[in-house]
């Protein structure tokens, strides 16, 4: 009789634990992803969020100041110790590059901003550039906490310049004074990143650039397969002109997921038609002069 009582008590406690766990899980899921019957709950708009969405801390810093007018995009198809490019791979990857840049042009037009990118590319398949696109070592993607910081330094040296700043000034002169964007593309899986100037403390010699991998780490998709590559290109180029990630802090992600679920700085997708540049991101890159009204 005593054993039966203990067993019943154990079963009751087990049921209670499971029930409480489910209640907490459901409550958190409802809070984060929407209310009952599919109606989303609006996240609390704190003073901290209001202050955050009224600033654009990286706008106008570094070499990439104005995301408007005519801009030259210098694409470097970089080989390293683990990967290389051939003519076919370059041709395939030029498609998402063009699509990503077209997306930004169309979004600028939505805000009444004239923007046109001109693409120039460099690759080991081009005559005279074979040894100039070799990165000494392996390009690191940050997945293990380490990043490649000397990409532009190596490229500047390979092309015969004394510094990254001299490289930049040369390409700016060749582009008749237009803005110049530097993008290095590596033919392997990895986490793409933008080496963006975050504050005036970096000094005037800092040359912003993006390092883009052909696939997000672990996907290993052939270049002719549909992927989120175009949105990655657009996302990283927007970074270079001051657009911040909208998914770093949970409170920011919750609010932007509710307010601006399609924003390019919140996520990526293989269907660019599902993305846009929201009012806040437009403000951070200078397309509008005032921050958005928040509710």
What are these regions (language model features)?
Residues 13-25:
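Hydrophobic membrane-insertion alpha-helices, especially the h-region
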Residues 34-177:
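Propeptide-to-catalytic entry region of secreted or membrane-anchored zinc metalloproteases
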Residues 237-252:
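Catalytic Zn2+-binding segment of zinc metalloproteases
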Residues 25-37:
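Hydrophobic single-pass membrane-insertion segments
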Residues 2-16:
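N-terminal Sec-pathway targeting helices
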Residues 161-207:
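Auxiliary, metal-adjacent structural segments of Zn-dependent hydrolase domains
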Residues 211-233:
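Short pre-active-site segment immediately N-terminal to the catalytic Zn-binding motif
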């Amino acid at each position: 009789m005593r054993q039966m009582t203990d067993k019943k008590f154990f079963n009751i406690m087990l049921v209670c634990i499971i029930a409480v766990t489910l209640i907490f899980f459901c409550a958190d899921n409802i809070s984060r992803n929407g209310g009952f019957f599919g109606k989303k709950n609006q996240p609390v708009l704190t003073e901290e969020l209001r202050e955050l969405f009224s600033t654009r801390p990286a706008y106008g810093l570094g070499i990439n100041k104005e995301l408007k007018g005519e801009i030259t995009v210098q694409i470097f198809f970089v080989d390293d110790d683990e990967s290389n490019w051939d003519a076919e791979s370059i041709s395939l990857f030029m498609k998402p590059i063009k699509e990503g840049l077209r997306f930004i042009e169309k979004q600028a037009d939505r805000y009444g901003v004239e923007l046109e990118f001109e693409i120039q590319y460099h690759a080991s398949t081009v005559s005279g550039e074979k040894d100039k696109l070799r990165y000494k070592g392996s390009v690191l993607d940050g997945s293990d906490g380490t990043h490649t910081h000397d990409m532009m330094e190596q490229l500047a040296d390979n092309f015969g310049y004394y510094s990254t700043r001299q490289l930049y000034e040369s390409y700016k002169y060749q582009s008749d004074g237009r803005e110049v964007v530097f993008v290095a593309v590596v033919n392997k899986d990895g986490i793409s990143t933008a080496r963006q100037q975050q504050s005036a403390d970096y000094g005037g010699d800092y040359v912003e650039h993006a390092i883009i991998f052909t696939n997000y780490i672990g996907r290993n998709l052939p270049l002719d397969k549909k992927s989120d590559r175009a949105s990655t290109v657009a996302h990283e180029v927007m970074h270079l002109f001051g657009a911040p990630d909208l998914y770093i802090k949970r409170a920011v992600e919750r609010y932007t997921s509710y307010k601006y679920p399609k924003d390019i700085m919140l996520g990526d997708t293989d269907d660019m038609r599902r993305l846009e540049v929201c009012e806040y991101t437009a403000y951070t890159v200078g397309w509008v002069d005032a921050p958005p009204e928040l509710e």
